[in-house]
Amino acid sequence: MMIEAYFSAIVFDPCPTCPPGLKHPLTLQGRIGVIADSHGNIASMTDCIQRLTDRRADTIIHLGDIFDSEIHHNLMNIVDVITDNNILAVKGNNDYQIEKSLENGHPMDLDPSDRQRIRQFLHSLALYFTSGNVCFAHSRPFDSIRAFYEPIDTGSTEQAARIFRHTDHHLLFCGHSHLPMLFRWRAGIVTREPIPEQTPLVFQKNEKYIIIVGSADKGECGFIDREKMVYERIRL
């Protein structure tokens, strides 16, 4: 499985389908763990990584908001957990706020070398990953700041329907909203459904899906089996 990471100078743009910046193909295997919205909770993030490793995930992806803009301790430890475990990650709105604060000279009680390393880490994060018709993003999979600030789940299917109309993604895995939720496109109809805890979701070829994984800070993560084409919600 080939995956492409999209990086870009982040600007506000009213066009949701702006062309992405640079493409860097990566190789993924069949079992993928997904984590989102750990918000500086290093214990919960580590527990998610361990649970997904126990499930023999070949790759683990963090879907953004690794940090919390209001929590400035353990920043370097969080970066170490991500890098030491070879976690792929996309940028969330809280990560962007931390990045901008550091760029604007906020010391955050960090050594200069740690501050520089955290800045480099945040700058390196992709806005989203794609692999064929599968996408991993913090929220909406478009190339602008607005995309990772605006939630897909607003209690209706409006934003999900827009994504289904404007993209070719068969599967989108994202975070931002902290409640696990499924949006399903079937024959032009979009539905909003809870994700069951005990029953794996089997993907159908004639349907499209948006999976909101849920917050690791609240004990949620997910497991994708590409060979079986199933998704499992995992509670810590």
Which positions does each model-derived feature cover?
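Short, acidic/polar N-cap/turn motifs at the starts of alpha helices
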Residues: 22, 124-128, 200, 221
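Core catalytic region of metal-dependent phosphoesterases/phosphodiesterases
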Residues: 6-12, 25-31, 35, 40-123
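Conserved catalytic scaffold of divalent metal-dependent phosphoesterases
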Residues: 73-74, 79-173, 177-187
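Non-catalytic terminal accessory segments
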Residues: 5-6, 161
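Structural motif
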Residues: 59, 171, 208-211
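Divalent metal-dependent hydrolysis catalytic cores, especially in the metallo-beta-lactamase
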Residues: 65, 177, 181, 215
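Active-site-proximal beta-strand elements of phosphoester/diester hydrolases
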Residues: 30-39, 133-140, 210-214
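Binuclear metal-dependent phosphoesterase catalytic core
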Residues: 26-29, 190, 194-236
